[in-house]
Amino acid sequence: MSISSDEVNFLVYRYLQESGFSHSAFTFGIESHISQSNINGALVPPAALISIIQKGLQYVEAEVSINEDGTLFDGRPIESLSLIDAVMPDVVQTRQQAYRDKLAQQQAAAAAAAAAAASQQGSAKNGENTANGEENGAHTIANNHTDMMEVDGDVEIPPNKAVVLRGHESEVFICAWNPVSDLLASGSGDSTARIWNLSENSTSGSTQLVLRHCIREGGQDVPSNKDVTSLDWNSEGTLLATGSYDGFARIWTKDGNLASTLGQHKGPIFALKWNKKGNFILSAGVDKTTIIWDAHTGEAKQQFPFHSAPALDVDWQSNNTFASCSTDMCIHVCKLGQDRPIKTFQGHTNEVNAIKWDPTGNLLASCSDDMTLKIWSMKQDNCVHDLQAHNKEIYTIKWSPTGPGTNNPNANLMLASASFDSTVRLWDVDRGICIHTLTKHQEPVYSVAFSPDGRYLASGSFDKCVHIWNTQTGALVHSYRGTGGIFEVCWNAAGDKVGASASDGSVCVLDLRK
């Protein structure tokens, strides 16, 4: 048997990633030098650490079931071993003794019951058994009802309305629809991005373009074996940009051909966005910097070294001005050509996970591990609203495509927040109040996305469920349970399909047409 610390560290690192502890995974990966190991992550299946621990637990349970001489232990386990039980010293001997004691008690109780039963009349005995049976049965039903998630059968999306796309060999962290056609891009821990053709005249899930992320070693292109962490289509739908844990950003054609490799970051890229004009790409990295790239030449136009810790997210305000947030709890607004931030927002007391400008570019929303959602304006230093309602970390936020300056000007502007407290909240930002709390999820919610008309909100959680909500009433209108925890949800341009990427390597497409 051979176990190396690199192997153990890699399995722990993957477990943290798969469980949604992205910041912890990043810190552990840096401290344990994961990037310097020779382990091919694409070959390691999802949930590998849990799988090997379960096998170890089964081995200990087998030990408990066998005597020292190799014969089968005649006790019967009264309950399964927990993981903590299994690592306790002398667990085999203590469990076997506990089983013997329990068996002796049961035998004594059975003998006493038999003696008592023999002295009673048969009719009375039968009546007692019937009463006990009804009581126990009712108790069982009540427990089952409590454990099940209450989702109305009428809202469940039938299997014939869900297409499951398989091909990725590891968890799929991100997905995004092409803005002009039914092409769905996905990015995975298997060091590939994929483009799936979901148009009516295609062969659906059978057509996938594999975008392999390679690095140059010894004059050859070899797989990077690093996660694809971010991707974004340009507004014309002709180019796809990807960011990777290998530190490179890449530009691909929609046909899957590599157009440019952008290399100036000194570590993993966490976020990446095209500007609306399509001439610049913005990236955020663990090296504490953000970079504006020229999409035509692949050259870095300007690097912004203002954060004191890894940059986690970026968002364009205009074609040359953007905001960035970081684990340093700060938000900087920067402009191409300026050698310092044009605005800095401070007020969060923990890592700032995501930032988003509203459709007009006037208000900036931010969410944090400090459990707050804050709204900022370039006209003042302090936040306009400090929204506190979630009781765990807020992972992401999205503005609705409604209100002034949008295609839906007569609908009210809303903001959605997704939290590790398993809830999604919809906010009226003008009044600074929560208008709906959406509570059907059972695990942390990692992604929310508004439909193009703003009438519906999709949410994806690690409980494997995608829920579709009516934004006006807060009612659940569609629900789908996949085969893995959901990392990302997104709507196509027509607003009739929702894509979702999952921890088991699957990508599902939900057809919401009647």
Swiss-Prot record:
Widely expressed including the pituitary, hypothalamus, white and brown adipose tissue, muscle and liver. GO terms for cellular component: histone deacetylase complex; mitotic spindle; nucleoplasm; nucleus; transcription repressor complex. Gene3D superfamilies: 1.20.960.30, YVTN repeat-like/Quinoprotein amine dehydrogenase. The modification N6-acetyllysine is found at residue 102. Residues 120-139 are annotated as: Disordered. Residues 120-135 have a biased composition (Low complexity). Changing residue 446 to C: In PRPTS; does not affect assembly into the N-Cor repressor complex. One of its GO terms (biological process) is fat pad development. GO terms for molecular function: beta-catenin binding; histone binding; transcription cis-regulatory region binding; transcription corepressor activity. It is found in: Nucleus. The keyword Phosphoprotein applies. PROSITE patterns: LISH (PS50896), WD_REPEATS_1 (PS00678), WD_REPEATS_2 (PS50082), WD_REPEATS_REGION (PS50294). Its main location: nucleus. It comes from the Eukaryota. The keyword Phosphoprotein applies. The modification Phosphoserine is found at residue 119. SUPFAM superfamilies: WD40 repeat-like (SSF50978). The modification N-acetylserine is found at residue 2. Residues 41-86 form the F-box-like domain. The F-box-like domain is related to the F-box domain, and apparently displays the same function as component of ubiquitin E3 ligase complexes. Component of the N-Cor repressor complex, at least composed of NCOR1, NCOR2, HDAC3, TBL1X, TBL1XR1, CORO2A and GPS2. Probable component of some E3 ubiquitin ligase complex. Interacts with histones H2B and H4. Interacts with MECP2; bridges interaction between MECP2 and NCOR1. Interacts with USP44. F-box-like protein involved in the recruitment of the ubiquitin/19S proteasome complex to nuclear receptor-regulated transcription units. Plays an essential role in transcription activation mediated by nuclear receptors. Probably acts as integral component of the N-Cor corepressor complex that mediates the recruitment of the 19S proteasome complex, leading to the subsequent proteasomal degradation of N-Cor complex, thereby allowing cofactor exchange, and transcription activation. This is F-box-like/WD repeat-containing protein TBL1XR1. It comes from Homo sapiens (Human).
